C-alpha cells in the first residue's frame, strides 16, 4: 500500500501497480541478503501468493558468469536461475527475457526490458498474469456512451458499462467516500472507492481503513454505471522503495548470502503492469469510526455512477491479499 501511495502522490495521472510482482523480485533479493539489508526487504515484502488460483506468478534470475555466486543462493533460486554473459550478448539476453515475460502474461506485457548494460551482474524478472470473469457480468448491449469528469471542469466521453444487481456497498459520509465491491469468479473481487475529495482520501488511505469500510458495507441493490478501461504503466521503483525504507540494496548492500563481491548493488528496479476491464471481467498482466447511513428495513436501490476519478483494489477475498492497486483519472479503451 505504501508503494501505491507514493505513486498516487507523485503523479496526477492514472496509476496501476502489482504488489505481487514487486514482492516476487524483492523475495529473490532477500534470499541473498543479510543484516539490515535483509530486514528492510522483509518489511517491504507482501505475503506470498503462490497458492492463489487463477494467478500466475513467475520469477527468473539471470546471473553473469563473472559473478561468483554462492551455492546457498544458487540452491534457493535453482529452478529459476540462468547463467548468462551480459558483456558478450546483452541484446540477445534482452530479447530472451522479453519473450519469457510475454509468454507468461499472455502477450499483455511486451518489451518489458528496453535495454541491458554490459556491466550488469544480476538481473531479476518477475511476471504476473490474472484473468478472471465477473460473477455478475455486464451486458455489452447495455454499454453506452457516458460522461466522465476528469476534473470538476473537464469531462470526456467514455464507454460506460451498466448493471443492476446486489452488491456490497457503503457510503461513509463523514470520510467522503462511497465504496462498492464487484465480485469475480474464484473468490476475488474489485473494490471501487469513489471519493468526494480524491487528494484528501489518497493522503489518508491505508489497508486498515479499506478493511473498516468493507466491514461497514451492506448488501444493496445497485444500479451501477462503471467505465470500461484499460491501461499500461511503467515505473522505476528506486525512489518508491527508498521512501518505504528499502535503501541499502541500492548503496552498500549486504548480499553476503549471494556473493563475496562487495561491489554488487541494485542499480534499478523496473515495474510494468497492464489491466483491461470489460463487461466480461478483468485481465491484468481495524476499528475505525464511520457514519454509515442506515435506512432500516427495506432499503431503496442505490444509483451509483462512477463518473469521476476513483481508486480500485483487486484482492483475494479469503486472505485479503492485494494483487493490484490502481487509480483511474481518465479512462481509456
Swiss-Prot record:
Q: Which InterPro entries match?
A: Serpin_CS, Serpin_dom, Serpin_fam, Serpin_sf, Serpin_sf_1, Serpin_sf_2
Principal location listed in the UniProt entry: host cell
An annotated GO cellular component of this protein is: extracellular space
Family according to the record: Belongs to the serpin family. Poxviruses subfamily.
Give the protein's biological function: Weak inhibitor of the interleukin-1-beta converting enzyme (ICE) and of granzyme B. Does not form a stable complex with ICE, but can for a stable complex with granzyme B.
Q: Which PANTHER family match?
A: GH10112P-RELATED (PTHR11461:SF211), SERINE PROTEASE INHIBITOR, SERPIN (PTHR11461)
Q: From the Swiss-Prot or TrEMBL record, give the protein name.
A: Serine proteinase inhibitor 2
Q: From which source organism is this entry?
A: Myxoma virus (strain Lausanne)
Amino acid at each position: 500500500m505504501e508503494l501505491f501511495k507514493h505513486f498516487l502522490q507523485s503523479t496526477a495521472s492514472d496509476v496501476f501497480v502489482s504488489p505481487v510482482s514487486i514482492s516476487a523480485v524483492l523475495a529473490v533479493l532477500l534470499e541473498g541478503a543479510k543484516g539490515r539489508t535483509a530486514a528492510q526487504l522483509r518489511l517491504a515484502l507482501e505475503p506470498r501468493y503462490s497458492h492463489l488460483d487463477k494467478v500466475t506468478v513467475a520469477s527468473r534470475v539471470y546471473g553473469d558468469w563473472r559473478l561468483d555466486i554462492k551455492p546457498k543462493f544458487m540452491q534457493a533460486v535453482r529452478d529459476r536461475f540462468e547463467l548468462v554473459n551480459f558483456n558478450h550478448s546483452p541484446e540477445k539476453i534482452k530479447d530472451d527475457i522479453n519473450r519469457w515475460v510475454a509468454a507468461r502474461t499472455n502477450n499483455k506485457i511486451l518489451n518489458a526490458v528496453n535495454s541491458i548494460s554490459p556491466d550488469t551482474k544480476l538481473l531479476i524478472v518477475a511476471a504476473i498474469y490474472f484473468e478472471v470473469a465477473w460473477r455478475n457480468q455486464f451486458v455489452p448491449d447495455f454499454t453506452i456512451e457516458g460522461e466522465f469528469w476528469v476534473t470538476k471542469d473537464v469531462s470526456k466521453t467514455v464507454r460506460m458499462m451498466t448493471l443492476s444487481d446486489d452488491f456490497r456497498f457503503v457510503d461513509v459520509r463523514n470520510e467522503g467516500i462511497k465504496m462498492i465491491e464487484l465480485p469475480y469468479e474464484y473468490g476475488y473481487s474489485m473494490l471501487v472507492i469513489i471519493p468526494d475529495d480524491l487528494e484528501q482520501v489518497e493522503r489518508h488511505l491505508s489497508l486498515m481503513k479499506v478493511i473498516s469500510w468493507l466491514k461497514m458495507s451492506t448488501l444493496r441493490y445497485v444500479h451501477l454505471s462503471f467505465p470500461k478501461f484499460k491501461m499500461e504503466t511503467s515505473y522505476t521503483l528506486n525512489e518508491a522503495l527508498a521512501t518505504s525504507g528499502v535503501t541499502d540494496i541500492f548503496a552498500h548492500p549486504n548480499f553476503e548470502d549471494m556473493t563475496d563481491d562487495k561491489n554488487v548493488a541494485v542499480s534499478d528496479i523496473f515495474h510494468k503492469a497492464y489491466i483491461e476491464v470489460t463487461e466480461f471481467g478483468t485481465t491484468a498482466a481495524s476499528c475505525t469510526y464511520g457514519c454509515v447511513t442506515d435506512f432500516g428495513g427495506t432499503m431503496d436501490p442505490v444509483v451509483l455512477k462512477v463518473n469521476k476519478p476513483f481508486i480500485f483494489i483487486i484482492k483475494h477475498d479469503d486472505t485479503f491479499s492485494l494483487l493490484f492497486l490502481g487509480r483511474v483519472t481518465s479512462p481509456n479503451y
